[in-house]
Amino acid sequence: QEPDNAAFFCSVVRYASLNDHSTGALYSPDLSEVILCNKLPSCNQAFIGRKDEIKAIASHLSNQSVLFITGMAGIGKSEVAKAYAQTNRKKYTNIIYLYYTGDLRKDIANLTFADDSVEMNEEVRFQNHYKVMQRLHTDTLLILDNFNVLPKDEPFLKELMKNNMQLLITSRCKLKNYDSIEIKELDKEKELTELFYKHCPSAKRDPDSVSAII
């Protein structure tokens, strides 16, 4: 009888830890030892500014679960997404980073889970991984980076968006039917100048030339 009692109490503790009964909120299981080799990439050391954009992302995700970060190539979409995640890390039980390669199901299958085995084919891995993802809630952030296709061209995106976790998606595409925030050029007078000095500190001696360059 003792093993049964132990299992019962373990289940009760787990249920209580994953649910906030005072607010009705549901919490995700901690996947830090489930998904392996999925550390959030660090921001570029030269990253500056974008405080307003990061605040706008936080404001949106407090009310809606999906947001696209759009903008031209090289403007800093991925860096903003990573900066948001790092700034708000304490809000989340899990932060999952997924680099889109053109097939969302394959990208999910190619995540490394602790219980993967060499006998599993791609479809089995996908099914196992996605079952775990379906148990996640709004305290999990999934960053889908490099999603440079229209949503209609990725069949699995709508299915992924049905889940309860938060999705932050970077894309070069201009989208009309989805909530998005566009990343624009840095402020010339302040942020671009600061970025220039980070790459070329000696230029501080000649601010007029720097101003002419940028």
Question: Which residues does each PLM region occupy?
Answer:
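A short acidic, amphipathic alpha-helical/loop segment
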Residues: V34, V80-Y84, E154-E159, A212
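Alpha-helical sensor/transducer elements of the RecA-like P-loop NTPase core
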Residues: E79, A109-L111, E159-A212
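Short amphipathic recognition helices of helix-turn-helix/homeodomain-type DNA-binding modules
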Residues: Q1-L31
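Post-nucleotide-binding-loop coupling segment downstream of the phosphate-binding loop, primarily
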Residues: A46, D52-H60, S65-H137
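Conserved ATPase-coupling elements of RecA-like P-loop NTPase cores
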Residues: F147-L157, Y178-D179
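Conserved P-loop NTPase "ATPase switch" module shared by AAA+ and STAND
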Residues: M133-K152
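Conserved adenine-nucleotide phosphate-binding loops and their immediately adjacent elements
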Residues: F9, G24-S59
